[in-house]
A protein has these predicted regions:
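Flexible "cap/lid" loop of the alpha/beta hydrolase fold
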Residues: 96, 102-134
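Conserved HGGG/HGGXW glycine-rich cap/lid loop of the alpha/beta-hydrolase fold
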Residues: 2-51
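Active-site loop/oxyanion-hole signature of alpha/beta-hydrolase fold enzymes
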Residues: 37-80
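Conserved alpha/beta-hydrolase catalytic His-Asp/Glu region
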Residues: 138-192
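Short beta-strand/loop motif that positions the catalytic acidic residue
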Residues: 195, 201-203, 207
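Gly/Ala-rich beta-loop-alpha elbow adjacent to hydrolase catalytic centers
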Residues: 83-87, 91
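Conserved alpha/beta-hydrolase "acid-adjacent" motif
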Residues: 208-214
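Catalytic histidine-centered segment of alpha/beta-hydrolase-like enzymes
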Residues: 232-245
Length: 253
């Protein structure tokens, strides 16, 4: 690809997560693209907007996020968008509805309901762990379960756990908003037209939450570039942030 350094980025997290969950990855990304402007957006019902209701469909989430980006002045030039899981569904909708906004899109560990069956979009092996989150009220226990489910290499990292516990204590995502996001993800069926901008897919072959076959299905449908990490979990930037930024540099520069 052409050299796209000096550009602006928008980053989107996934289900029931907020922008602070990017953690140290932001430092890693900035180190690789030192001249770039990196901007983080919170999905409705998360982060700074935790007291607001989340829509139950990807289209509405997309429109609210775009309004947020416009308000902050992030869209006066096309952006590189980097998104994980649910956030990647929003990114896909964004580039289809507003192609003038997006220069490139990198989508990590995501899935679409019209391309992959439900038992791949949420791996059946994780059902018990996933359901236990719904009945866990203790914040530390809940965040520990999420970390165990989404990370393969840092599942016992007490520093990460403390950070996540603090985030949830300060800006808790409600059970209702979590359900709304689950509904949005479960029902999302993108249009079948080819993406209007360059797209890179990244997935984790050992993702225990979403099957890597889901990214493969997206790759096959539109003949997109897919790069796979052999051992990381669902939270790819947590487990392999250095690998992610290397792929971005190789692809963009």
């Amino acid at each position: 690809m052409n050299n796209l350094t000096g550009q602006r980025w928008i980053l989107l997290r996934g289900l029931a997560r907020e922008s602070r969950h990017w953690g140290a990855f932001i430092v890693q990304l900035q180190a690789i693209f030192p001249e770039d402007e990196i901007n983080l957006l919170d999905l409705p019902g998360t982060g700074r907007f935790y007291q607001e209701p989340s829509p139950n469909n990807i289209q509405a989430i997309c429109h609210q996020l775009r309004a947020q980006a416009l308000d902050k002045g992030y869209l006066d030039q096309p952006v590189n968008i980097l998104a994980l899981s649910l956030g990647a569904m929003v990114a896909w909708e964004w580039m289809q509805c507003y192609p003038e906004d997006i220069a490139t899109a990198t989508l990590m560990n995501t899935s679409f309901s019209n391309l992959s069956p439900f038992y791949q979009r949420l791996r059946w092996q994780s059902y018990q762990q996933f359901l236990s989150l719904a009945v866990t009220r203790n914040i530390k226990q809940k965040e520990a379960k999420i970390l165990q489910l989404t990370s393969n290499s840092r599942a016992d990292d007490q520093c990460i756990l403390l950070e996540w516990e603090t985030i949830q204590s300060e800006q808790p995502i409600s059970f209702k908003n979590s359900l709304q996001q689950i509904c949005a993800a479960a029902t999302y069926k993108p249009c079948k037209s080819k993406p209007p901008c360059p797209v890179l897919l990244l997935n984790s072959l050992q993702d225990r939450l979403v099957s890597p076959l889901c990214s493969m299905a997206i790759q096959k449908q539109w003949q997109l570039e897919l790069r796979s990490h052999p051992s990381a979990g669902h939270d790819l930037t947590l487990d392999a942030g250095d690998w992610v930024v290397r792929q971005l540099k190789d692809w963009l520069v």
